[in-house]
């Protein structure tokens, strides 16, 4: 059973939003306070978003479908790949190609081309063609692999999509909404939560925060066959919470590792 504590969220800097001037007004309901012109997110609502997302993911997996992990920004790319691979799920971590969902059949043709080139490389075909042809095919394979490796084994549309930074991944969101694919996303203070089915209010820039959220989704997938849920431990009262926020703010943890103060 996954155990999430308020303290673990604080330690990851989940509660730090962007500068006050960058607020999307639709995020106001998720704001707890502000410190030094930085918005502080309401971790009670973050915990609820985690719980809702965890339950949605488990329903999707039990229905025999997959969750597509999406995060192409620098802070998220490696984490997205690691956690998607850990839970044996498809992922996009380099660039979202228009039509990955809405023009899925065409994308599958490109995937089949990639698989064919990979097969040619190992079945001896390359031994029978010129070096120039090999070079051309390798360039084509590398180009395809860069954007399609993570979805090579995604034979059908996913049952849900998990996104880091919905502002950056707007095309993916538009395609998922068009196809009525449920969207789970970490929503920072500069995001629009209304286009997300399961918004998780949180810092989508700091590496530790991104890693924590992505691991939670991966854990939900791995535990879907164990009939276990998620345990939320609210181990800080409001006074302690404010003290922790002040301490973290003083240490400037929000801007560590590509944090959120901009």
Curated annotation (Swiss-Prot):
- Tell me yes or no: is Ribonucleoprotein among this UniProt entry's keywords: yes
Which GO CC annotations does the UniProt entry carry?
cytosolic small ribosomal subunit
UniProtKB keywords: Ribonucleoprotein, Ribosomal protein
The reply on keyword Ribonucleoprotein is yes
Please provide the Gene Ontology terms (biological process) for this protein: translation
InterPro entries per record? Ribosomal_uS2, Ribosomal_uS2_bac/mit/plastid, Ribosomal_uS2_CS, Ribosomal_uS2_flav_dom_sf
| GO molecular function terms listed in the Swiss-Prot or TrEMBL record | structural constituent of ribosome
Q: Name one Pfam family in it.
A: Ribosomal_S2
What PANTHER family does the database record attribute to this sequence? 30S RIBOSOMAL PROTEIN S2 PROKARYOTIC AND ORGANELLAR (PTHR12534), SMALL RIBOSOMAL SUBUNIT PROTEIN US2M (PTHR12534:SF0)
| Family indicated by similarity | Belongs to the universal ribosomal protein uS2 family.
Annotated protein name in UniProt: Small ribosomal subunit protein uS2
Q: Which organism is it from?
A: Borreliella burgdorferi (strain ZS7)
């Amino acid at each position: 059973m996954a155990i999430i504590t308020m303290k673990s969220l604080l330690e990851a800097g989940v509660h730090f939003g962007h500068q006050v001037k960058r607020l999307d007004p639709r995020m106001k309901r998720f704001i707890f306070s502000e410190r030094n012109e930085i918005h502080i997110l309401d971790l009670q609502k973050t915990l609820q978003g985690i719980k809702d997302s965890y339950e949605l993911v488990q329903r999707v997996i039990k229905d025999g479908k997959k969750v597509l992990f999406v995060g192409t920004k620098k802070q998220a790319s490696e984490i997205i790949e690691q956690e998607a691979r850990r839970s044996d799920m498809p992922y996009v971590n380099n660039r979202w190609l228009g039509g990955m969902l809405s023009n899925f059949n065409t994308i599958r043709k490109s995937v089949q081309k990639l698989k064919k080139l990979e097969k040619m490389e190992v079945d001896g075909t390359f031994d029978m063609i010129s070096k120039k042809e090999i070079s051309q095919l390798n360039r084509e394979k590398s180009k395809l692999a860069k954007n399609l490796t993570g979805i090579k084994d995604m034979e059908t549309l996913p049952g849900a999509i998990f996104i880091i930074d919905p502002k950056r991944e707007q095309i993916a969101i538009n395609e998922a909404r068009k196809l009525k694919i449920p969207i789970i996303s970490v929503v920072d203070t500069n995001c629009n939560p209304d286009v997300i089915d399961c918004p998780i209010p949180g810092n989508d820039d700091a590496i530790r925060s991104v890693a924590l959220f992505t691991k939670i989704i991966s854990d939900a997938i791995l535990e879907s066959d164990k009939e276990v849920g998620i345990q939320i431990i609210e181990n800080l009262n409001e006074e302690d919470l404010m003290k922790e926020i002040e301490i973290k703010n003083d240490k400037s943890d929000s801007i560590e590792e590509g944090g959120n103060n901009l």
